[in-house]
Amino acid sequence: MNQKFNLKANNFIKNMLRYSYLIIMALLLNAVVNEIIVSANKIISVNIDYMLSGEAVDIGSIIEKFIYLTLSGFVLSFAGSRLSLKYAVRVINSYRKQISCKLYRIDYSYYDNAGTATIINKVNSDIAEAESFLTEHFATIITNITAALIYANYVRRINVVLFVAVVVSYPLVIWLSNILVKKMRDVSKVYRLKVDAMLGIDHEAIMGYQIIKAFGLQKYFENRMHKASEELVETEQIRTGISNTAIVIRRLIQWIPSILCAFLSIWLVRSGQLTVGELVGFVVILEKFVESIIGIPFAIVDATGCMVCIGRLEGILSAKDEHFGDKTYKATNIANSVSDENVLDEDYVIEFDNIKFAYKEGENVLNDVSFKIKNGENIAIVGSSGGGKTTIFRLLCGLYHASDGTYKLYGMDINEWNIESARENMALVSQDTFLFPGTIEENIRYGNINATHDEVVNACKDARIHDFIEGLTDGYETVISEGGSQLSGGQRQRIAIARAILKNTPILLLDEPTSAIDEGTEQLIQDALDRLCKGKTSITIAHRLSTIKDADRIIVLQHGRIVEAGTHKQLLDMGGVYAEMYGEG
């Protein structure tokens, strides 16, 4: 992934330009402050020459001017700082929202390829670095530029020779800073990857805490973390070394114009080309001029690490979006259909025609898969692990596109659908039920955000979970932790079923909903599923073949191909793959 700070197509810069009026105002105020410094310097310079020539000097007037200029400079500097901070906050807030929205639109394959810890690190740590770029480095760069221009004009007017002496070392500064920028960029990329790796281990340790304890893997994970931490520290030391080298070089280079100007000033004063007052004014402004002009490239060196982080964030924003059409439809048997939407009433709800799919090029997971599902049919998909069952569900949900072949939903090619509209026609109950941190009612209401409490209760009654919830101290307001770890597998499944009931969609996708449930709980869940599937088109990935005997049709997958299809009885009579699987079960 190209992580260079791309000026042509960079969302971060677009956000910077969006609020550029704020930073322009801050720059103008900063320019006025620097002009005030120059004006104060001129007052000192002129009055020293007056005093040395024997002319009278009004000390009181000079003090009044200095007080006025100092107060004005303080007020304007404060206002400029506030505007600069406001600019940074606005840009980062807009950029953060842009990234957050992108994460909901991004193609599902991005999440498959990027680690969870890496994405979290980018969204949190890299955003913080981007904010640091605006509040510290960018502000320093632009204020140094305005200051350098104003001071350069002042020094040039005092004496051109001194001006040349100040800028003579600048090519050396540019050359050295470019070298340091390249080194810092390379090291910063490695550093961010090391941080990702360490956070990845943390994430694994937290998510797999029970397994780690059960299998005694504490030492193994401690060693992994120790190694990752050491590698991170080593990279950080290199990064710090480059930064410290930049500081030392900057200080050494700053001495070059100072030494040159010291000798030249003596010669210019002696030759009468420079007055004592001008010399004093030059000496006072010299440090600020040198600091600002040399500070620009070295501020870029310091900002390089932040630019790498911005490049990583741009990687998210440049990732492929889910690509589908813009047509919006609802099936006629959805209870909450609205009149302003196109309504479909096709005989065939789902059609797969010679579907091929590969996660990696050349390694097909599905090969020439074809089937049609009528409205109201109860279909089961069975097969050995890795046969392509879950992949079919991912294609049905629009998480992936088929490599070849056609997938139609209600007679319309899936690529023509608005994907959100397509998914509104489906509800998923998975074997790995995910519950969000929050109350039980909130988790169920994700099926229909606008549902009333009574509707939630009715859904729970149909899902055979209402009595359990009512038995809890806080009932539906019971707060559950991430993943619902304090609930049993069966309880989580029934909450997921209640969520699907509340969504009230014509198509149900059931991904082995009873595979990890004991037989006692299985009957409760099966009863809930029967209520859920009544009058709906349902597709079930089955692990326990005993649960799908009543399916209208069973599709048998093997190595990504459909090898058999029929009713339970028909498949047993064939004596093929299904019969063998059923006998083994």
Label each PLM-derived region with a short phrase:
Residues 36, 40, 58, 124-168, ...:
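Hydrophobic alpha-helical transmembrane segments of ABC transporter permease domains
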Residues 217, 241, 289-319, 325-326:
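Cytosolic ends of transmembrane helices, especially the final helix of ABC transmembrane type-1 domains
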Residues 108-109, 125-134, 138, 183-204, ...:
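An intracellular "coupling" helix at the cytosolic face of ABC transporter transmembrane type-1 domains
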Residues 66-77, 170-174, 243-257, 263, ...:
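Hydrophobic alpha-helical segments in the permease module
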